[in-house]
């Protein structure tokens, strides 16, 4: 049987600020790079005091086309109020580049069985947000990494690389597939040492 080609699919973060959701597939391996919320998220339907109702999981998000319907990605609890069927996870991981909401806000809806990879410091910040109530991400299989510690997931190897950004512990990723490398910068700025 011939192996499928590596591919890259953009579900957000193209032609907009934030909302990065980039899917990398190689053979049977599927990983996301970030899973955030766009800066313009729902602005045509809501305001600061009127937004998708959290108690309805993804129902409002799907009805208003604010988040993509992707089979095997979302938790059963998030899908329960919707007519979208739950299926077992079909993704092997989600890599979060840094703590900013436009790169991680929608991990709260992901199936708990999908590992979430993030830098050690980003994980500590996320934990503090959970503790203080700033963010609600839920229980997940969090796996931390450091620069120089590549993560191998089936057919894909992800190399985390520190980038300069307005928050500590920001990463870009070099994603090694069977057909070559994909470089994902996350967010970066051109300050600091060269």
Description of each model-found segment:
Residues 2-16, 20-93, 102-194:
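His/Asp/Glu-rich metal-coordinating catalytic cores
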